[in-house]
Amino acid sequence: MSMQDPISDMLTRIRNGQAASKVSVKMPSSKQKVAIAAVLKAEGYVTEFVVAGDTKPELEVTLKYFEGKKVIDTIKRVSRPGLRIYKGANDLPKVMAGLGIAIISTSHGVMTDRAARKASIGGEIICYVS
C-alpha cells in the first residue's frame, strides 16, 4: 500500500520522535521533505538533517531539545491532499502572533511565512510550527 501523504508522515514522525525524546528520526527522503527540513533547521527547530543512501535515499532529522524540553511544541499539517490551502502574500497567517512559523511552498521554493511576506509572494501553506 502506498503512502497517501508523505509530508504528514514526516511531521508525525518528528512529533512522535520528540514525544518519545528520541535523538533523531528517519524517514524516506524527497526534495520537498529536504526543503522543509532545511527551513526547520534555519529557524532553529531541528539541529541537523542528513540525506543518506543511493537507491532509496533516507532523510535523518536530528531533533533539538533545550534544557531537556522539546523545542517544537506543536507541528500541524494545514494543506493536505484532500483540501489544499493557498493564500496570497497579503493573507499569509501569523502563527502565535509571530512567535511560530508557517512553512509555505511558493513558486520560489519552500520558505517561512515571514520570508514569503517580505518577498510579496503567496503559496500553499504546508504546516504551522511553534
UniProtKB/Swiss-Prot annotation:
InterPro entries: Ribosomal_uS8, Ribosomal_uS8_CS, Ribosomal_uS8_sf. Coiled coil: none annotated. GO terms for molecular function: rRNA binding; structural constituent of ribosome. Keywords: Ribonucleoprotein, Ribosomal protein, RNA-binding, rRNA-binding. One of its GO terms (cellular component) is ribosome. It comes from the Bacteria. One of its GO terms (biological process) is translation. The keyword rRNA-binding applies. HAMAP family: Ribosomal_uS8_B. Part of the 30S ribosomal subunit. Contacts proteins S5 and S12. NCBIfam families: PRK00136.1 (NF001109). Belongs to the universal ribosomal protein uS8 family. One of the primary rRNA binding proteins, it binds directly to 16S rRNA central domain where it helps coordinate assembly of the platform of the 30S subunit. This is Small ribosomal subunit protein uS8.
